[in-house]
């Protein structure tokens, strides 16, 4: 319930998760397999890192098919309200709902309203290092990232770049990671959190990323 008087219901796409629900003979009430303040685990080994000693068993369903956080929508109000943006975008929701709004607390941090959804009230889904997203044309993005990363290295930072396959060869940093081709949004979504965790594992303190918004 997230502290509210409503209940969120989710039907997972994972075949392993569906089998678990089937074998349970009903419904499963459980929190997500991650601790707040870390990138969401997309592999069983990341769940083990976060939950070691806290759970007795981990069901390994392989790499996740999507990888991004789920979209949370409040259907108790009209029009429906997005409480947490996720893989299912506002545009896709509008195709099946007669209009949809965004939670005012997400649009304006100074609104005085507290976000209703888990993960929107504090640092969440974030790597340990500082993450900077750079927007613009491909050549300008690569030029800016390389210049900024060089300055950061001189300042003692361990730098990382999160980039697309198309631009990967253009970057200069201590650690360079590819999340997929710019034309393959599903691949980018599936790999994003795993790559952020890899930056943590390699001790990267400053991460620069291309913008992958469509």
Feature-to-residue mapping (PLM):
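Active-site-adjacent structural elements in enzyme catalytic cores
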Residues: 1-214
């Amino acid at each position: 319930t997230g502290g509210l008087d409503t209940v969120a219901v989710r039907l997972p796409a994972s075949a392993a998760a569906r089998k678990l629900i089937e074998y349970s003979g009903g419904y499963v009430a459980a929190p997500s397999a991650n601790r707040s303040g870390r990138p969401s685990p997309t592999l069983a080994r990341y769940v083990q890192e976060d939950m070691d000693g806290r759970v007795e068993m981990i069901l390994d369903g392989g790499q996740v098919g999507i990888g991004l956080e789920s979209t949370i929508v409040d259907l108790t109000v009209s029009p429906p309200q997005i409480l947490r943006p996720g893989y299912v975008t506002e545009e896709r929701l509008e195709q099946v709902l007669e209009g949809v709004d965004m939670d005012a607390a997400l649009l304006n941090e100074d609104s005085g309203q507290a976000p209703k959804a888990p993960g929107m009230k504090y640092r969440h889904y974030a790597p340990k290092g500082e993450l900077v997203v750079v927007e613009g044309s491909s050549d300008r993005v690569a030029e800016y990232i390389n210049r900024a990363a060089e300055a950061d290295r001189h300042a003692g930072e361990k730098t990382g770049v999160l980039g697309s396959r198309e631009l990967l060869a253009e970057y200069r940093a201590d650690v360079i990671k590819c999340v997929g081709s710019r034309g393959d949004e599903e691949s980018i979504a599936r790999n994003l959190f795993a790559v952020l965790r890899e930056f943590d594992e390699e001790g990267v303190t400053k991460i620069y990323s291309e913008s992958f918004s469509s």
